[in-house]
């Protein structure tokens, strides 16, 4: 079991952190590489467990995947993917079941090869993330989908057919899957109520570079099927969730961090709320600087909602800051129904948190105390790290392997700015 040991040295974090390419952008783009019979080269790729799991899935289908590390620092790696010799359509259960985005391989495999078999997707246990919307949309396009225990078998005779798809609610994954499926479909596919997150737009940009015919009109995406896609070179957008997490590290410790490789426009949906609680955001050539204005952290009322609103992936980290804010804060979680698991662990540090259905009420206290904690998922682990930075004494976070699914070398980056964090297995 991986453990993180954090010692509070009462130092504000000061320094520079390089922001990686987006985890939530690179994974669907890796899946989309299946649509090309030529090589694709991806730059600004993060070195994460989920990236390597997706690489294994692609390799199991016959792809050649080459991850090239940037030896200079812990970011901006390169990934070359060649899907010219795909010879299998069955994804191994053991790997697919560990990765939520394994389901995104369904759309491109159906579109290019007419068949795919995968397991129900894994990932973080943060509540229901149903794939019903994916399945319904693909069936509307002509796919036959069977569920055999924990496996999903999808086939189509001939080509998928362009259709008008209207999602009952906004779904990033379903939007991405249908976009990829529609790339080679016969005719025009229109997606109404589509997700327009930056990561979805990055996928569309990647597909268009390869030759896809895609247009966007507000929350409508229109895809006209083409015959083939070429290879391309593409740079993954910065990870706004990683940037937001480190921004909160600066605010919580009263420090000042330069976040290199991120533009303010990339994280405006996050910094708007951070400024409300007392953050100062400054621009510089190549990134932004985050610090806390004079005084303590202010309380706030925040609700998570689809882009361009505050993202659910930042909710646990924000709660950590609210634990030591002046006054009472309320966080409403509108995306996932089981995303308050970190609250129990924050209480072990002394936090005053009450949960009622989708709302968390946090009464700020002056200080936290170190404790023995257990992580449950990726973002909750990040939240516990942030809170532990200002908890008196030592804090141990058990089951911390979740962190490496979304943050490359977080402990090294924070230590370079003054933190005292060590890792043990």
Swiss-Prot record:
Active site: 124 (proton donor)
Zinc among keywords: no
Residues reported to bind phosphoenolpyruvate: 23-24
Gene Ontology terms for molecular function: UDP-N-acetylglucosamine 1-carboxyvinyltransferase activity
Compartment(s) where it occurs, according to its Swiss-Prot or TrEMBL record: Cytoplasm
Binding site for UDP-N-acetyl-alpha-D-glucosamine: 100, 313, 335
One GO BP annotation of this record: UDP-N-acetylgalactosamine biosynthetic process
Signal peptide (UniProt feature, chain positions): none
SUPFAM superfamilies associated with the record: EPT/RTPC-like
The keyword Magnesium appears for this protein: no
Keyword terms, alphabetized: Cell cycle, Cell division, Cell shape, Cell wall biogenesis/degradation, Cytoplasm, Peptidoglycan synthesis, Pyruvate, Transferase
Positions carrying 2-(S-cysteinyl)pyruvic acid O-phosphothioketal: 124
Catalyses which reaction(s): phosphoenolpyruvate + UDP-N-acetyl-alpha-D-glucosamine = UDP-N-acetyl-3-O-(1-carboxyvinyl)-alpha-D-glucosamine + phosphate
EC number: 2.5.1.7
Gene Ontology, cellular component aspect: cytoplasm
HAMAP family named among the record's database cross-references: MurA
Family (UniProt): Belongs to the EPSP synthase family. MurA subfamily.
NCBIfam families: murA, PRK09369.1
UniProt cross-references to PANTHER family, sorted A to Z: UDP-N-ACETYLGLUCOSAMINE 1-CARBOXYVINYLTRANSFERASE
Name of the protein in question: UDP-N-acetylglucosamine 1-carboxyvinyltransferase
Native species: Wolbachia pipientis wMel
């Amino acid at each position: 079991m991986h453990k993180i040991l954090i010692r509070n040295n009462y130092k504000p974090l000061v320094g520079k952190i390089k922001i990686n390419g987006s985890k939530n952008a690179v994974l669907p783009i890796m899946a989309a590489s299946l649509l090309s019979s030529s090589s694709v080269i991806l730059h600004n790729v993060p070195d994460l467990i989920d990236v390597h799991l997706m690489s294994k899935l692609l390799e199991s289908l016959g792809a050649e995947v080459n991850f090239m590390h940037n030896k200079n620092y812990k970011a901006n790696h390169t990934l070359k993917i060649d899907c010219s010799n795909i010879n299998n359509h069955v994804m191994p259960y053991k790997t697919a079941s560990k990765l939520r985005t394994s389901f995104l391989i369904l759309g491109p495999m159906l579109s290019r090869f007419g068949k795919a078999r995968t397991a129900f997707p894994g990932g973080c246990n943060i509540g229901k993330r149903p794939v019903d919307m994916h399945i319904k949309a693909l069936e509307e396009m002509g796919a036959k989908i069977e569920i055999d225990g924990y496996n999903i078998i999808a086939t189509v005779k001939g080509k998928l057919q362009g259709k008008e798809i209207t999602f009952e609610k906004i779904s990033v994954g379903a939007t991405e899957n249908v976009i990829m499926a529609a790339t080679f479909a016969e005719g025009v596919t229109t997606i109404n109520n589509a997700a327009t997150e930056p990561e979805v737009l990055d996928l569309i940009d990647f597909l268009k570079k390869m030759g896809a015919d895609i247009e966007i009109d507000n929350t409508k995406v229109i895809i006209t099927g083409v015959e083939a896609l070429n290879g391309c070179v593409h740079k993954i957008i910065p990870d706004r969730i990683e940037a937001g997490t480190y921004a909160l590290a600066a605010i919580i410790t009263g420090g000042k961090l330069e976040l290199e490789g991120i533009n303010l426009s990339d994280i405006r949906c996050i910094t708007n709320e951070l400024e409300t609680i007392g953050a100062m955001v400054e621009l510089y050539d190549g990134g932004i600087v985050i610090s806390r204005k004079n005084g303590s952290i202010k309380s706030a009322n925040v609700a998570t909602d689809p882009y361009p609103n505050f993202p659910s992936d930042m909710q646990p980290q924000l709660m950590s800051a609210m634990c030591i804010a002046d006054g009472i804060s309320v966080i409403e979680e509108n995306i996932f129904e089981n995303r308050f698991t970190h609250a129990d662990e924050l209480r072990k540090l002394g936090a005053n948190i009450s949960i009622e259905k989708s709302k968390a009420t946090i009464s700020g206290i002056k200080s936290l105390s170190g404790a023995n904690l257990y992580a449950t998922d990726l973002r909750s682990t990040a939240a516990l790290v942030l809170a532990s930075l200002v908890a008196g004494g030592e804090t141990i976070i058990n089951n911390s392997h979740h962190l490496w699914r979304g943050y490359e070398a977080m402990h090294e980056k924070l230590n370079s700015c003054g933190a005292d964090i060590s890792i043990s297995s």
